[in-house]
Every structure is written in structure tokens, then in C-alpha cells.
Design a protein with these regions (language model features):
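Cofactor-/ligand-binding subdomain signature composed of acidic, glycine-rich
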Residues: 1-52
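Hydrophobic alpha-helical positions that pack around
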Residues: 138-264, 276
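Short amphipathic, charge-patterned alpha-helical segments
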Residues: 113-117, 263-281
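Ferredoxin-type iron-sulfur electron-transfer modules in oxidoreductases and energy-metabolism complexes
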Residues: 35-52, 81-83, 89, 98-103, ...
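Conserved phosphate/anionic-ligand binding catalytic regions in large, soluble enzymes, centered on
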Residues: 53-74, 174-186, 190-192, 345-357, ...
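Histidine-anchored nucleotide/phosphate-binding helix
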Residues: 106-120
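Gly-rich Lys/Arg/Thr-decorated short loops/hinges at beta-loop-alpha junctions or inter-strand turns
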Residues: 27-34, 88-99, 202-207, 249-254
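Short acidic, glycine/serine/threonine-rich loops at helix termini
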Residues: 64, 69-72, 96-99, 138-143, ...
Length: 431
């Protein structure tokens, strides 16, 4: 297993990396661009590539888990005008840090994956929208783009073929809302980053009103490995409906926080072993399995759960981006929720009234409980506000703010009640 600045990464996507071998020559030595070269030299049909992705079971790695091959098939192939391909590297959710490592340590995997996607969907222009707060990694990706252009893997008539693809990097300004695909498109167009109503969906009305396909960084980076390994073989790495591997960003109270790539369906207990177990030998109390928007799960339940979309959903949460936040027995759930609710209150774009007003209401109520001024009716009021936000906003940020509130109260109600009754925390030591 490779250690990169205390991050421990296992293949496929980040195989054999040492922190310095991110350049084009290094990537080619590892078999890089062989999938793209084979496609262009053999003239493989775009439909065959999309069929392979469907067979592979690859699902979007950004959070929604939508089947990638199916999404690519939505792009109208015979559209007479410009079409666009967009990568969402606007990684801003607390606990998530996998995509920045991909563009830092293996940027050419992303570039090759996007080029293959462009070929499969008949697209000639693409953009990678990179989160504003990862500036050094943005510069790294720009360097990789220059290398790919100079070597003929990007630009006009790639590798002497009739296929042309121009790929550009765009640096965002750090707004969490721009991780939502239509807000990202608005920002990319130079407008205020606010979500659009859907429908129409980006596949029919996307960037500049043109058909657009948007995928996450890890999703694109997986494509070359799928084609090199074989779609069926990639699928077999995981489990039914959960093909391949997934990078999990584990943080919190573990000995070795970092990025770990494991097959989907791997027991959570195995991931904990890879991360060195609980820090200081403490007991596991709670886990947020898919980024800060995913409902919290009690530690004992999570220890008996597998890491795949269906198993996590059955346990009452969602896999999301694969950002696993582990909390030990000393963590106060009220204070943890206070931090989460403040984040969503600050990051709401303000477009929808339920989210704009509701996130503030939830934050202030949790703040009141945490600081010893809670009232018994606050519990029902918090749930009521969350219920009136969820499903009533243009985008999923409202849901992302509401779900942690409901899950924390459901799974750790006793701590909230103790705070309200005794005016202090149930656990003796907390952040």
C-alpha cells in the first residue's frame, strides 16, 4: 500500500504512486493512454464503449450513484451543434478529499477518461471545474493538460485520428453549492452559482444551453481501467449492482486517516483495519458513511455493514461520495450536529426559501441546545423544520441539511434530551 503524505491508497485508480510519478511519462509506463490509443487505432464504435460501461456496473462516484453508461447514452449523438463534457471536481463537502488526490497524483487518468468519454458521446470540448480551495492541485492539473496536448493525447486529430477534443481547466471560487451540477454550469458560464430547475436536464440543456454530460472526477478516472481490465472483470471486483472499486476518504478518530480504494461490498470492518482501527483504542460511537450530508449511523450497526450503495441504504444512510467520518465514544453528537448545521447554513445559496430560512432555524436551535438553553419542544421543532425543508428545494442542499438533523435525533436522541434537561453534555470529553 502506498503512503502519500499520510494518505494510504490502494489501486486501481491510484496504483503504484509515490507522490512524484504523476507526469505523462510515468503514466504511460503504467499503461496509461493505452485504452484511448486502442480505441482510436482500432476504430472501436462509440456504442461499444458505452455498452462496456453498462456491463461494468460503474456508478457515479460523486454521490448520486447513477449508472454511468446509462447517463452517457442520454447524450444525443446526432445533435447538429456543439456539445460539452464537464468533470465535477468541485469537491467541497466536509470529509471528502479523494478527487483532489486524483488530480494531484494521477491527473492523466482523469484526462484519458474524459477523452474516452468525449469520443463515446461525440463531444469535442470539455471542462474540468476544480474547487477553488485546492489551488495547488489546479496548477498540477494544468501542467498535466499541457503534457497531454504536447504528446498528442488532446487537441486536433488525436493520435492521427479524426477525433479532436479540447479540454480546459476552470478554477471555481470555493462555493459548496457549485458541486450541484446545474449550479456548476451556471458558474462555468460566468453567472452566480445557483441551481437550475430540472427538467430540462443537462443532457438536453446544459452548458450554454447545449447538451452536456457531467461526471465526477473518480468516475472519469475509472474509465481507462475498466476498458483495460475488461468490463466483466471490473464488475466482478465488486458485487451485483455495485461493480468495481471505490475510493473511501476516511477521517476522524482513526489511527491512519486517508484514502483507501477497496472493492465495493468490502465490510466496513475491513476498512477500519486498513485505517489502523480506532485512535487510542477507544470505542466506535458513530459513523457518517458518505460525506457530511449522509445520515449518521451508530457504530455497532456500521461495523456489521458492507461498503456498497445497497448495504448502506439498508442501514439507513447513503454511500454518497465515500467520505467516511468516524467518531469515538468521547464525541458529543449535539456539538457534531452544530458544526454540520452551521456548514449548511453558511453554504445555502439562498435561492429557495425553505433552505435559506430553514437552515438558519436548525442551526440556531442546535446552538441553543448545545449552549444549555434548549427547551423540550426543540426536538419536535427541529424535526418539523427538517421535514419542511426536505424535498421542497430546487436542489439537494436542503435535503443535505435536513438529513443529518433527523438522523442525529433519531439515533442519539438521549444525548439531545440530556443536554436540554441538564444544560450540559452527556459525554465528559468532547471537541
Amino acid at each position: 500500500m502506498t503512503s502519500l503524505h499520510d494518505r494510504h491508497i490502494k489501486p486501481l485508480i491510484l496504483k503504484d504512486l509515490n507522490g512524484d510519478n504523476w507526469h505523462l511519462a510515468d503514466y504511460v509506463k503504467r499503461g496509461g493512454y493505452s485504452a484511448l490509443r486502442k480505441i482510436l487505432e482500432e476504430g472501436i464504435a462509440p456504442e461499444a464503449i458505452i455498452a462496456d460501461l453498462k456491463t461494468s456496473g460503474l456508478r457515479g462516484r460523486g454521490g448520486a450513484g447513477f449508472p454511468t453508461g446509462l447517463k452517457w447514452s442520454f447524450m444525443p449523438r446526432q445533435y447538429p451543434g456543439q456539445k460539452y463534457l464537464v468533470c465535477n471536481t468541485d469537491e467541497g463537502e466536509p470529509g471528502t478529499f479523494k478527487d483532489r488526490d486524483i488530480i494531484r497524483y494521477n491527473p492523466h487518468a482523469l484526462i484519458e477518461g474524459m477523452a474516452i468519454g468525449a469520443y463515446a458521446m461525440g463531444i469535442t470540448v470539455g471542462y474540468n471545474y476544480i474547487h477553488g480551495e485546492i489551488f495547488q492541485d489546479y496548477l498540477r492539473f494544468e501542467e498535466a493538460l499541457e503534457e497531454a496536448r504536447a504528446a498528442g493525447f488532446l487537441g486536433d486529430n488525436i493520435l492521427g485520428s479524426q477525433f479532436s477534443f479540447q479540454l480546459h481547466a476552470h478554477h471555481g471560487y470555493g462555493a459548496y453549492i457549485c458541486g450541484e451540477e446545474t449550479a456548476l454550469l451556471e458558474s462555468l458560464e460566468g453567472k452566480k452559482g445557483q441551481p437550475r430547475f430540472k427538467p430540462p436536464f443537462p443532457a438536453s440543456f446544459g452548458l450554454y444551453g447545449k447538451p452536456t454530460t457531467i461526471n465526477n472526477t473518480e468516475t472519469f478516472a475509472a474509465v481507462p481501467f475498466i476498458l483495460n481490465l475488461g468490463a466483466a472483470e471490473y464488475m466482478a471486483l465488486g458485487k451485483p449492482n455495485n461493480g468495481g472499486t471505490k475510493i473511501f476518504s476516511i477521517s476522524g478518530d482513526v489511527e491512519r486517516p486517508g484514502n483507501y480504494e477497496v472493492p465495493l461490498g468490502t465490510p466496513f470492518a475491513t476498512l477500519m483495519e486498513l485505517a489502523g482501527g480506532m485512535r487510542g483504542g477507544k470505542k466506535i460511537k458513530a459513523v457518517i458513511p458518505g460525506g457530511s450530508s449522509a445520515p449518521v449511523i451508530r457504530g455497532d450497526v456500521m461495523m456489521n455493514t458492507d461498503l456498497d450503495y445497497d448495504s448502506i441504504a439498508k442501514a439507513g444512510s447513503m454511500l454518497g461520495s465515500g467520505a467516511v467520518i468516524v467518531m469515538d465514544e468521547t464525541r458529543c453528537m449535539v456539538k457534531s450536529l452544530l458544526r454540520l448545521s452551521y456548514f449548511y447554513y453558511e453554504e445555502s445559496c439562498g435561492q429557495c426559501t425553505p433552505c435559506r430560512e430553514g437552515t438558519g432555524w436548525m442551526y440556531r436551535m442546535v446552538h441553543r441546545i448545545e449552549n444549555g438553553h434548549g427547551r423540550p419542544e426543540d426536538m419536535d421543532m427541529l424535526n418539523s423544520v427538517a421535514d419542511n425543508i426536505q424535498g421542497r428545494t430546487i436542489c439537494a442542499l436542503g435535503d443535505a441539511a435536513a438529513m443529518p438533523v433527523r438522523a442525529m435525533i433519531k439515533n442519539f436522541r438521549e444525548e439531545f434530551e440530556y443536554h436540554i434537561e441538564h444544560k450540559h453534555c452527556l459525554v465528559p470529553t468532547y471537541l
